[in-house]
Amino acid sequence: MSEKHPGPLVVEGKLSDAERMKLESNYLRGTIAEDLNDGLTGGFKGDNFLLIRFHGMYQQDDRDIRAERAEQKLEPRHAMLLRCRLPGGVITTTQWQAIDKFAADNTIYGSIRLTNRQTFQFHGILKKNVKPVHQMLHSVGLDALATANDMNRNVLCTSNPYESQLHAEAYEWAKKISEHLLPRTRAYAEIWLDQEKVAITDEEPILGQTYLPRKFKTTVVIPPQNDIDLHANDMNFVAIAENGKLVGFNLLVGGGLSIEHGNKKTYARTASEFGYLPLEHTLAVAEAVVTTQRDWGNRTDRKNAKTKYTLERVGLETFKAEVERRAGIKFEPIRPYEFTGRGDRIGWVKGIDNNWHLTLFIENGRILDYPGRPLKTGLLEIAKIHQGEFRITANQNLIIASVPESQKAKIETLARDHGLMNAVSAQRENSMACVSFPTCPLAMAEAERFLPSFTDKVEAILEKHGIPDEHIVMRVTGCPNGCGRAMLAEIGLVGKAPGRYNLHLGGNRIGTRIPRMYQENITEPDILASLDELIGRWAKEREAGEGFGDFTVRAGIIRPVLDPARDFWE
């Protein structure tokens, strides 16, 4: 592994322009406040275009009408995506009612998009509504700080509806980690919440004046569920319990899925085990991992700036020893843990506290009133009467949590009446896509708009081969940045060009193996032809309980990725 080829602790060379931008931004202020008042353009200019990402927003435009507007000599229809900070995906029904109203009244698309990072996004916020959205969030105890760009992003936590006490403890740690790693700059409060500037120099004791070299993602995981896909993340705390009570965490570092087409210096990587730590060291260890990456991460090349590349460059043992030094601890040996699945259990589940939890399947996380299926209205009506909370899952679904027996029938009636409990196949429940077109500027191929009809065709293949109740973990991502987490799927499609994808095979159901590229730059008919043949073989030749991804590896159809830094592209 990495120790065979240790590299420098710090990469020397000309810093990327992003580093200049951060340094000159006055702790993320830039000239955003002035830009807000420029009515000549619907977008943000210069450095502000990137700086708003630190405030939880991306500037986008509707790519479906981009060419048409260009012909009319109009600028693109700029609008912002805003992503809320929501550790563990827990949101109150009061907060839900507020975001429902904002989506309806102040966004182009009128939808709420649940993401696979356990939060929600608004798409289509015009510039005039940017400040009001931050103020609305603040009024209900939410914010969008540090949900994008070079910071610790939204902290995920297993949406475990069974063991309520353990989930509550893990969720509290997810919140503590999130708060501890937040930026300290007052820029967010000054710009969006009109808080007074104070005569105190900003300091960033953890993140530093130029923040992190690249995005950084953290999870808290409760085995045996790997619903949050820990191997997609930089830093992972795997909960270890004794007698149902949380006692500590196993730490895994250096996961990440983003690649660049054709760039063999990039690769998807699973996280590496560092060791076990008692609870009282959690925040010190989290800070130590982040500051080590802050100081050692590559600031000359953003394509090689994530923690996974730092770990490979300096060596796992070197990185681990530095974390131990900074945190003032020695990791204990990894404690036993096992993952058995990562899908959500759709429907009602009774928790150990005798409350009920209803997990609703939301295809691709898009909450909108569809013809005959008014999902958004249904959730609003549930929010008006539900005394518990909602939980957004990392599979883009929604849990109506902590429902007392007395409310169960009423909530189920509302859900059914609004199309929120329509029967779907196991295959559809285990399929997921990122947003992609028309709003994502990085999209190379369709994802969210492509997946439903593509799933229909995969369902037909399963039916053809006599296994209609089976499922394959299937993900579509519109570009190699990998937001759809296709690089941890059994079938992963990565957008290459309009209507064309790279097909990856060989991941597994529990999300612990990176799939390898099987075919490159192929169309939907080619993909379906390959899947028809391979699913047919799987149906006939599989061993008892063997998932599709495991079968493709065992049958020699695809070689497993064992050491991504060296064999991902082979």
UniProtKB/Swiss-Prot annotation:
One of its GO terms (cellular component) is sulfite reductase complex (NADPH). Pfam families: NIR_SIR (PF01077), NIR_SIR_ferr (PF03460). It catalyses: hydrogen sulfide + 3 NADP(+) + 3 H2O = sulfite + 3 NADPH + 4 H(+). Its cofactor is siroheme; [4Fe-4S] cluster. Signal peptide: none annotated. Keywords: 4Fe-4S, Amino-acid biosynthesis, Cysteine biosynthesis, Heme, Iron, Iron-sulfur, Metal-binding, NADP, Oxidoreductase. It is an enzyme of class 1 (oxidoreductase). Its EC number is 1.8.1.2. Siroheme binds at C483. Belongs to the nitrite and sulfite reductase 4Fe-4S domain family. HAMAP family: CysI. PANTHER family: SULFITE REDUCTASE [NADPH] SUBUNIT BETA (PTHR11493:SF47), SULFITE REDUCTASE [NADPH] SUBUNIT BETA-RELATED (PTHR11493). Alpha(8)-beta(8). The alpha component is a flavoprotein, the beta component is a hemoprotein. Component of the sulfite reductase complex that catalyzes the 6-electron reduction of sulfite to sulfide. This is one of several activities required for the biosynthesis of L-cysteine from sulfate. This is Sulfite reductase [NADPH] hemoprotein beta-component. It comes from Salmonella enteritidis PT4 (strain P125109). The lineage of its organism: Bacteria, Pseudomonadati, Pseudomonadota, Gammaproteobacteria, Enterobacterales. The gene is cysI.
